[in-house]
């Protein structure tokens, strides 16, 4: 397996124009630049946090293109390229590969609830269409069905460039089953910020993170502390960050994180309908937690 990634990988928000009808391209570039300066280990454009479900196909492609260009090889770009239509997932995946994404993140098809055999067919077709590394994305709370570890193991055995999984079930037992069932070099990335440290402890190698949009340095510090063997410091940071992790999920993601990104002075916007702007009590909670961590700009 050639592709390796570990560490803190922000799942980028997509900032929209004021009327929500277009992408704030300059703001997206500024956000990526800020996160690179903070030392993140990769980025994910056009995922759940990036509102892929309400991007047009042209916008989805453009977001990937912008991020690949702005990153310019500094860290891996893992492009969100999933869909509940296998045909559309193929189109997005081949486009992401063509414009230079280092890997693709391919979500379990949502809404139509395929059986495991259907998931195997879906991901097999994607693997046969691209040569770039593929990271599977298991998030049953958003998709309505789960990728079983045994299915992931079959896919990894059949296709050497299916290299890992973003595991966002929130169930540590499921995480451990993925690690037990898949090859030793299969990458497991946490998809739940508050479980990052526990998942590292059982064999995960990093996190595709919502929190890292607003607290990238702290997330990187926690990971680096763990990696260097300073478990006590990693644990301290884990508990310091927990209230913020929780605050970022008091409403449907990415409603809170888009408010938080604005609070820390980065480019943001409300989400597109059918999501909406964060409630005032959510904004106040976020403001308090960000302030505790010293993340608000002066006067914020």
UniProtKB/Swiss-Prot annotation:
Enzyme Commission numbers on file: 4.3.3.7
Lineage: superkingdom: Archaea
Cellular localization per UniProt: Cytoplasm
InterPro entries (alphabetical): Aldolase_TIM (IPR013785), DapA (IPR005263), DapA-like (IPR002220), Schiff_base-form_aldolases_AS (IPR020625), Schiff_base-form_aldolases_CS (IPR020624)
GO terms for biological process, alphabetical: diaminopimelate biosynthetic process; lysine biosynthetic process via diaminopimelate
Pathway: Amino-acid biosynthesis; L-lysine biosynthesis via DAP pathway; (S)-tetrahydrodipicolinate from L-aspartate: step 3/4
UniProt site (Part of a proton relay during catalysis): 48, 111
Primary localisation category: cytoplasm
KW Lyase (keyword) present: yes
Catalytic-site annotation from UniProt: 137, 166
Catalytically driven reaction(s): L-aspartate 4-semialdehyde + pyruvate = (2S,4S)-4-hydroxy-2,3,4,5-tetrahydrodipicolinate + H2O + H(+)
PROSITE patterns cross-referenced by the UniProt entry: DHDPS_1, DHDPS_2
GO cellular component, one term: cytoplasm
Amino acids binding pyruvate: 49, 208
Keywords, in A-Z order: Amino-acid biosynthesis, Cytoplasm, Diaminopimelate biosynthesis, Lyase, Lysine biosynthesis, Schiff base
Short name of one Pfam family: DHDPS
SMART domains: DHDPS
GO molecular function terms noted in the UniProt entry: 2-dehydro-3-deoxy-phosphogluconate aldolase activity; 4-hydroxy-tetrahydrodipicolinate synthase activity
Subunit structure of this chain's protein: Homotetramer; dimer of dimers.
Role description: Catalyzes the condensation of (S)-aspartate-beta-semialdehyde [(S)-ASA] and pyruvate to 4-hydroxy-tetrahydrodipicolinate (HTPA).
Protein name as it appears in the record: 4-hydroxy-tetrahydrodipicolinate synthase
Organism, as annotated: Methanopyrus kandleri (strain AV19 / DSM 6324 / JCM 9639 / NBRC 100938)
Gene for this chain: dapA
């Amino acid at each position: 397996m050639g592709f390796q990634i570990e560490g803190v990988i922000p799942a980028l928000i997509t900032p929209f124009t004021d009327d929500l009808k277009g992408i704030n391209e300059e703001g997206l570039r500024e956000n990526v630049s800020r996160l690179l300066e903070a030392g993140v280990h990769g980025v994910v454009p056009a995922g759940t946090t990036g509102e892929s479900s309400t991007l047009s196909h042209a916008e989805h492609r453009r977001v990937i293109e912008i991020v690949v260009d702005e990153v310019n090889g500094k860290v891996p770009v893992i492009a969100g390229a999933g869909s509940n239509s296998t045909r559309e997932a193929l189109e997005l995946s081949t486009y992401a590969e063509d414009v230079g994404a280092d890997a693709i993140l391919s979500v379990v098809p949502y809404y139509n609830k395929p059986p495991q055999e259907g998931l195997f067919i879906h991901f097999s077709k994607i693997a046969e269409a691209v040569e770039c590394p593929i990271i599977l994305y298991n998030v049953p709370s958003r998709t309505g069905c789960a990728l079983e570890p045994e299915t992931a193991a079959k896919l990894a055995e059949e296709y050497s460039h299916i290299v890992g999984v973003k595991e966002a079930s929130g169930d540590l037992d499921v995480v451990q089953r993925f690690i037990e069932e898949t090859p030793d070099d299969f990458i497991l990335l946490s998809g739940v910020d508050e479980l990052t440290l526990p998942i590292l402890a059982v064999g995960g190698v990093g996190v595709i993170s919502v929190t890292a949009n607003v607290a990238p340095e702290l997330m990187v510090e926690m990971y680096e502390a763990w990696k260097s063997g300073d478990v006590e410091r990693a644990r301290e940071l884990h508990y310091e960050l927990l209230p913020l992790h929780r605050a970022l999920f008091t409403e449907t993601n990415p409603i809170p994180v888009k408010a938080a990104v604005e609070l820390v002075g980065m480019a943001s916007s409300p989400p597109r309908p059918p999501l909406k702007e964060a409630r005032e009590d959510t904004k106040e909670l976020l403001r308090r937690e960000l302030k505790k961590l010293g993340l608000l700009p002066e006067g914020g």
